[in-house]
Amino acid sequence: MNIENEVHIENASESKREPKPPEGLLEDDTIYITTPYGKISLDGGRIQVKDSDGEIVASFPLEKVCTMNVFGSASVSTPLLKHCSDKEVVINYFTNFGKYFGSFVPSRNTIALVRRHQAGITKEKSLAICREIIHAKLQNSCVFLARKRVEVPSLLKELRDRSLHAVSVDSLRGIEGEAASIYFPMLSSSLPDEWRSDKRTRRPPRDELNALLSLTYTMVNTEVISALRQYNLDPFIGVMHVDRHGKPALALDLLEEFRPVFCDAFVARLINKRMITKDDFTQGSRLNDTAFKKYLGFYHDFMEESLKHPRFKYSVSRKKAIQIQAIIFRKAICGELKGYYPFIYAR
């Protein structure tokens, strides 16, 4: 079976949109409403979206919608809310920047089914997913280093290959930890001398490189959380990271495959192109206010840039690539796919 058909991702022609964000998008059984101050209402058998001037900007067939994701200041009419309650349609609310802040959840809803699958995932399936995630992370780490013309250590390649045969999640954690201790010095060596660091430090990061990495991991993790919420997955029920109060374990799991080719690549760009310099930091290795605003602009542009999806071979933004992984994960745990297919570069 063709995974692209199973996942119902947009095809190449559909991805060629105008530069401005779409007013509305129907994908699989989920719709996205991004119209500023939009009015979302019922019109016969369709969900209708009007802009602030009363013009219709989007329309969706009611029977195909299970989840509505509303961004920014758009409002939902009471008749539509009643319909959503009757038909078990979940509405998720996000800020303009994609930060989740709440949901309308009918007493009977699709969230329960997805969460049941999440909570009931077997150890065997969980291990299989973890293998794919860590293998993808280590392969993507090798790809990142190769793109930076850094010789990839043979032990890193060996650990990558061993990850597919790990017999437990604990052994995978050990493989990932050993690989990280090899990878970070190689990442550091690809940067200008004044930026290099001898080890990864957190809470707090002890130098400017670690500060940029920590900030970027946090930013991309927020994207992952938002994507999981959009597909009614609980970001706090993970397969590899330990469940702890306040820790989005599943988001941290899915973040792993994006760390090298999204997070580390972005930080390397900022440094190598002198978009951010050491003068932009305070004494505590934090970006000053002006530099942080610059950083946010650079980050937004980076996440909206198009790349060729390594599996589907058509252009998507990095933000979209993260959403695709949320779809694939949901379908994998619900039995709609044979397994989890990570975001992984062949070379």
Swiss-Prot record:
One of its GO terms (molecular function) is DNA endonuclease activity. Residues 1-21 have a biased composition (Basic and acidic residues). GO terms for biological process: defense response to virus; maintenance of CRISPR repeat elements. The keyword ATP-binding does not apply. Keywords: Antiviral defense, DNA-binding, Endonuclease, Hydrolase, Magnesium, Manganese, Metal-binding, Nuclease. Residues 1-25 are annotated as: Disordered. CRISPR (clustered regularly interspaced short palindromic repeat), is an adaptive immune system that provides protection against mobile genetic elements (viruses, transposable elements and conjugative plasmids). CRISPR clusters contain spacers, sequences complementary to antecedent mobile elements, and target invading nucleic acids. CRISPR clusters are transcribed and processed into CRISPR RNA (crRNA). Acts as a dsDNA endonuclease. Involved in the integration of spacer DNA into the CRISPR cassette. This is CRISPR-associated endonuclease Cas1 4. The lineage of its organism: Archaea, Methanobacteriati, Methanobacteriota, Stenosarchaea group, Methanomicrobia.
